[in-house]
């Protein structure tokens, strides 16, 4: 009765079952996996956020497949102001309700069934579901760690085939927190020319460079057909206000044809609503209030982790440049999932095992840096004591 593309293993995994049991017991859990800023004690002024939704213009229905010009202009202003992309035209944008929807639009644009998308490893578990729903095959290429993360270009070229349609980049990567360097960008553009592929670049964490130095956006990349995905879920810590987008850049003719086809896809669904689009200028401007708060927390939690690690030499953290996560390296005496389960049962600490993100082996735990500082400090202390024991 049901399609093969939705034939997923739907039963809860062991870690989820243990988490449910520990919660049911009433014991306090030190959750180091928090990804929702609205549950991390970080909030914008509700009067400003909700007030932006009260706009008489929203009573009029004006279906624009690419999105209302007011919203697209606000996104262009964000790129000019935050990332010095000065020549972005609103017509290069397609608004979506989420980056997941944006991925599905781009996959449908580029791929026939069983075509291939090259995806970094480690990275988002979400890609597998998005690929399944679009009948696309994922082929991984590794990021290698050597005093920081780099793309393994030898493996990228080996992974490519005549069915390759695009390379996914996450800039900065989740969970490694590594940005794509200028040298890597040049090499990726050359790869795209060699294989007639596009770049799909997820920049949801772009603004969260831990050193405070703005990183360049691929929205200004003109050397290969590039689809840059982002949204206010992370930029303004507003995941509940569904606004994301695709920026198409690259060779002029390819950009024009891609935009025309994306417009038809967007017109087929017309998923954007008027109140959110009209509020886009206010929502994007709120990043100026929330990002400094989040960056202070990211840095404080990272500093606290480093201080505690001084007393636990068996554990180390991997270098991280940006984003909301950090990777902890622990002795690989058991599987990451088994360790995460025992941490929950015996220390009430919740972490993500590395295999959730396709790390190359055991001994990796992924921690959220937006966790409230008191919870983070105590959770790390419990984790390190448990591993040491």
Question: What would you call each of these model-derived segments?
Answer:
Residues 154-157, 342-351, 357-389:
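PLP-dependent enzyme catalytic core of the Aspartate aminotransferase-like
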Residues 281, 297-306, 316-330:
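Conserved glycine-rich beta-strand-loop-beta hairpin in the small C-terminal domain of fold type I
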Residues 2-98, 105, 155, 283-286, ...:
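N-terminal small-domain helix-loop-helix segment of the aminotransferase-like
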Residues 203:
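Walker B catalytic acidic pair
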Residues 88-90, 319-324, 362:
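Short Gly/Ser/Thr- and Asp/Glu-enriched loop/turn motifs at secondary-structure junctions
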Residues 58-190, 194, 206-221, 227, ...:
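Conserved core of the PLP fold type I
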Residues 25, 134, 194-195, 347:
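Helix C-cap/helix->beta junction micro-motif
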